[in-house]
From Swiss-Prot:
Mg(2+) binds at D148, N177. InterPro entries: Dxylulose-5-P_synthase, THDP-binding, Transketo_C/PFOR_II, Transketolase-like_Pyr-bd, Transketolase_BS, Transketolase_C, Transketolase_CS. The gene is dxs. SUPFAM superfamilies: Thiamin diphosphate-binding fold (THDP-binding), TK C-terminal domain-like. It catalyses: D-glyceraldehyde 3-phosphate + pyruvate + H(+) = 1-deoxy-D-xylulose 5-phosphate + CO2. Keywords: Isoprene biosynthesis, Magnesium, Metal-binding, Thiamine biosynthesis, Thiamine pyrophosphate, Transferase. Gene3D superfamilies: 3.40.50.920, 3.40.50.970. This is 1-deoxy-D-xylulose-5-phosphate synthase. Pathway: Metabolic intermediate biosynthesis; 1-deoxy-D-xylulose 5-phosphate biosynthesis; 1-deoxy-D-xylulose 5-phosphate from D-glyceraldehyde 3-phosphate and pyruvate: step 1/1. HAMAP family: DXP_synth (MF_00315). It comes from Histophilus somni (strain 129Pt) (Haemophilus somnus).
Length: 617
């Protein structure tokens, strides 16, 4: 820590608040350098945190955290917060098994008020916390930091609308890192922000409201004049004013002294406050400033070279999906690809560039994405919604009400199904089979490799009804890709004929199942479909084997194994059943390999679980 003389002194925000203001620019420089060095050695989210260094320092300098409650939305930008709140020396463990959590996490620190991972939750939770503090007359402040992407979600605006109507004391900070700040405009904004957040303006504003409340024409004139002055710099402010907030900004989010002055002024204001700051994602590190998307989440890399390591030559399942999408779009101009702000992650970059008229990024709006797709299907188009398993949870009602009930031909390409690795509890794709399996009209497919994935996507595209294909994060296994052809709905595939024991596989654990089967001389069936289920195959297997093992990378409760159990019960089959899958707890971070081993879903673990079960029967 010799390179970081000031940062090495900061073990909590109390230490930070002992520094004089003239030391803060140096601290910000050290914090940014330390963040870059630590993340490059451990992997993690980089660009967002580089852009919030000054904001983080200013917030902990002005507010008395943890008494004052600071909430970070999503959490990608909270690495500097972790460093300043006693976790500096553990940053090398972030996102690793047993290490620091990738996002703010209540169990990890008293400074983490809200556990996060999904976007747009901070204002709703913050309002609840603020109202509780107001009811108990605690005198504590509530501050929510939300990004320009997360604030586009409907939930954020629902919360803003509520907060403005109840007029509770809280501060919402919009971290807008869409573009760099113009120096001239920034200076004007900073000056205006000091005026608008100052006590004189605040007193005049509140007094004026009372005095002019009985004089509508004059009141309206004053209001419009005020908004015109603000709108000269930021027309967006009018929107938040209409929602009931006192809007300040935009100001330079990298000017530590201006941030502190504005925050100190706003600290004394009553009612809902809204501060709009402009930051640059990747600030202070040229490669990240140039490519903020590429440096959003990074593997281990040499930060001195500024180059990210090249990925494997084997395509990911996301890339397999993207290639399939392009292949079909050439033939069918009515194919429409939809993503809720996950173009890169879902493998849709090439598709968006080659077929811009058939591509829609609806922003962080999963509910809208699904019902938008329903509308396209009603109009005769063929929508494909590319969505992570964990984010499909946010559109469950739309999946049922707007797609399935109307039996509309919408295809769901469900990425990151199963264990996702380093992002932990909030991002595991553990529940999609369970929450989809009970929905009528929905076809659900689980590919075992990339060729099966392509065929299932094509089958879902052609079947004329709601369909879902769920596939994992990471690289495919390198099998040969065959010409596209529709699969017969609800029909499984025999992989290996054995005796006594049969493994019914759902998904990409098939390679592990076949390894186990060699040692046990077991039958292996790639079930392919969770719905409709191949009940005929299950009946045949039950009549010729003494033990059926179901294998899936989904919660055991309500998953594919449960579907098999229900079928065996309905058929009144006398056969033992072992259901293997994800346990009834939220699964923490770790690599996919580490977590599958811990959950005993690799070949060794599957073999062990079967042998232990055999000893009981």
């Amino acid at each position: 820590m010799n390179k970081y003389p000031l940062l090495s002194l900061i073990n909590s925000p109390d230490d930070l608040r002992l520094l004089s203001k003239d030391k803060l620019p140096q601290l910000c420089q050290e914090l940014r350098s330390y963040l870059l060095e630590s993340v490059s050695q451990s992997s993690g989210h980089l660009a967002s945190g580089l852009g919030t260094v000054e904001l983080t320092v200013a917030l902990h300098y002005v507010f008395k955290t943890p008494f004052d409650q600071l909430l970070w939305d999503v959490g990608h930008q909270a690495y500097p917060h972790k460093i300043l709140t006693g976790r500096r020396d553990k940053m090398s463990t972030i996102r690793q098994k047993g290490g620091l959590h990738p996002f703010p996490w209540r169990e990890e620190s008293e400074f983490d008020v809200l556990s996060v991972g999904h976007s747009s939750t901070s204002i709703s939770a913050g309002l609840g916390i603020a109202i509780a503090a107001q009811k108990e007359n605690l005198g504590r402040k509530t501050i929510c930091v939300i990004g320009d992407g997360a604030i586009t979600a409907g939930m954020a605006f629902e919360a803003l609308n509520h907060a403005g109507s109840v007029h509770t004391d809280m501060l919402v900070i919009l971290n807008d890192n869409e573009m760099s700040i113009s120096e001239n405009v920034g200076a004007l904004n900073n000056h205006l922000a000091r005026l608008l957040s100052g006590s004189i303006y605040s007193t005049l504003r509140e007094s004026g409201k009372k005095i002019l409340s009985g004089l509508p024409p004059i009141k309206e004139f004053v209001k419009k004049t005020e908004e015109h002055v603000k709108g000269f710099v930021s027309p967006v402010g009018t929107l938040f004013e209409q929602l009931g907030f006192n809007y300040i900004g935009p100001i330079d989010g990298h000017n530590i002294h201006e941030l502190i002055s504005t925050l100190k002024n706003m600290q004394s204001l009553s009612g809902p406050q809204f501060l709009h700051i402009k930051t640059k994602k990747g600030k202070g590190y040229a490669p990240a400033e140039k490519d903020p998307i590429g440096f959003h989440g990074v593997p281990k890399f040499d930060h001195k070279l500024g180059e990210l390591p090249k990925s494997s030559t084997t395509p990911t399942y996301s890339q397999i999906f993207g290639s399939w999408l392009c292949e079909i779009a050439v033939q069918d101009e009515k194919l429409i690809g939809i993503t809720p702000a996950m173009r890169e992650g879902s493998g849709m970059v090439e598709f968006s560039q080659q077929f811009p008229q058939q591509y829609f990024d609806v922003a962080i709006a999963e509910q809208h994405a699904v019902t938008f797709a329903a509308g396209l299907a009603i109009a005769g188009y063929k929508p494909v919604v590319a969505i992570y398993s964990t984010f499909l949870q946010r559109a469950y009602d739309q999946l049922i009400h707007d797609v399935a009930i109307q039996n509309l031909p919408v295809l769901f390409a469900i990425d990151r199904a199963g264990i996702v690795g380093a992002d932990g509890q909030t991002h595991q794709g553990a529940f999609d089979l369970s929450f989809m399996r009970c929905i009528p009209n929905l076809v659900i497919m689980t590919p075992s490799n990339e060729n099966e994935c392509r065929q299932m996507l094509y089958t879902g595209y052609k079947c004329g009804k709601p369909a879902a294909v769920r596939y994992p994060r990471g690289n495919a296994i390198g099998v040969k890709l065959e010409p596209l052809a529709e699969l017969p709905l609800g029909k499984s595939k025999l992989i290996r004929q054995g005796k006594n024991i049969a493994i019914l596989n759902f998904g990409t654990l098939l390679s592990e199942a076949t390894k186990v089967a060699e040692d046990l001389d077991a039958t292996v069936v790639d079930m392919r479909f969770v719905k409709p289920l191949d009940t005929q195959r299950i009946q045949e297997i039950a009549q010729t084997h003494s033990l059926i093992v179901t294998l899936e990378e989904n919660a055991i409760q309500g998953g594919a194994g449960s579907a098999v159990a229900e079928t065996l019960y309905q058929q009144q089959q006398k056969v033992s059943l072992l259901q293997l899958g994800l346990p009834d707890n939220f699964i923490p971070q770790g690599t996919q390999k580490e977590m599958l081993a811990e959950l005993k879903l690799n070949a060794e673990g599957i073999f062990e679980q079967i042998k232990q079960f055999l000893q009981k029967i």
